[in-house]
Amino acid sequence: MNAIIIIPARLGSTRLPEKMLADIEGEPLIVRTWRQAMQCCRASRVVVATDSVKIAEVLTTYGAEVVMTSPEARCGSERIAEAARQFACDVVVNLQGDEPLISHETIDLALEPFFSPNPPDCSTLVFPLQPDDWAQLHDPNQVKVVLNREGYALYFSRSPIPFQRNQLTSTQCYRHVGLYAFKAEVLQCFAALPPTMLEEAESLEQLRLLEHGYRIRCMVTHDDQPGVNTAEDLELVRTLFKQRHQEA
């Protein structure tokens, strides 16, 4: 099985402009994420897909492989689908460029189901939440997911799901970790599909897959590392990197 990692990276960001080039202990954010991906054991190649010449020029100075993509892509998965057409592979990992602390073990975990006799259409990661974790459950920036008994996603939402009607019982809640691995052919089919009603209502591209009948296997991870979406996130990640360097 040949798996590749593609990291979509765009320069524009509403909440944190040019965050991909933000400095983290001497290296740009996107370079930090690329370095983590390069340590992955189950992928044979790591590529960054971008529509920004500025990002491409920075990455090439570090030796990263870069593919230029169209600025018309509607989401990260469409951008990696465009890039993936240039490579012969069985599985494509969509790793967000703003995840500089993600471990290679976590990426490998997302690829694990594709080594089974019955691989899924797509896999992703989820982190277990406590039912009383009110802040994360009610934060629309934290996407929640409910699973069936086999570990496949039933639904993703920015609202707290499942609703805890009976406070005397507790149901396991999960937060979605935005990393995906696709069968190569499923990725291309997904990118060709028009956006769906639920996808647009929640602003969650993975709902396009569920609405069209694809199955998403959710692997539970306990490695909870922050991504970079806001200026506050960036400062937290900088602090964590500094602590790691001091401990090394």
UniProtKB/Swiss-Prot annotation:
UniProt-listed InterPro entries: Cytidylyl_trans (IPR003329), KdsB (IPR004528), Nucleotide-diphossugar_trans (IPR029044)
Gene3D superfamilies listed in its UniProt record: Spore Coat Polysaccharide Biosynthesis Protein SpsA, Chain A (3.90.550.10)
EC number, UniProt record: 2.7.7.38
UniProt keyword Nucleotidyltransferase present: yes
Metabolic or biological pathway, per its Swiss-Prot or TrEMBL entry: Nucleotide-sugar biosynthesis; CMP-3-deoxy-D-manno-octulosonate biosynthesis; CMP-3-deoxy-D-manno-octulosonate from 3-deoxy-D-manno-octulosonate and CTP: step 1/1; Bacterial outer membrane biogenesis; lipopolysaccharide biosynthesis
Cellular-component GO terms for this entry: cytosol
MF (Gene Ontology): 3-deoxy-manno-octulosonate cytidylyltransferase activity
One BP annotation, GO: CMP-keto-3-deoxy-D-manno-octulosonic acid biosynthetic process
Keywords, alphabetical: Cytoplasm, Lipopolysaccharide biosynthesis, Nucleotidyltransferase, Transferase
Disulfide bonds: none
Annotated CDD domains: CMP-KDO-Synthetase (cd02517)
Classification via SUPFAM superfamilies: Nucleotide-diphospho-sugar transferases
Protein's UniProt keywords contain Oxidoreductase: no
Location relative to the cell: Cytoplasm
Signal peptide: none
Catalytic reaction list: 3-deoxy-alpha-D-manno-oct-2-ulosonate + CTP = CMP-3-deoxy-beta-D-manno-octulosonate + diphosphate
Family: Belongs to the KdsB family.
Function: Activates KDO (a required 8-carbon sugar) for incorporation into bacterial lipopolysaccharide in Gram-negative bacteria.
NCBIfam families, per the entry: kdsB, PRK05450.1-3, PRK05450.1-5, PRK13368.1
Protein known as: 3-deoxy-manno-octulosonate cytidylyltransferase
Organism for this UniProt entry: Chlorobium chlorochromatii (strain CaD3)
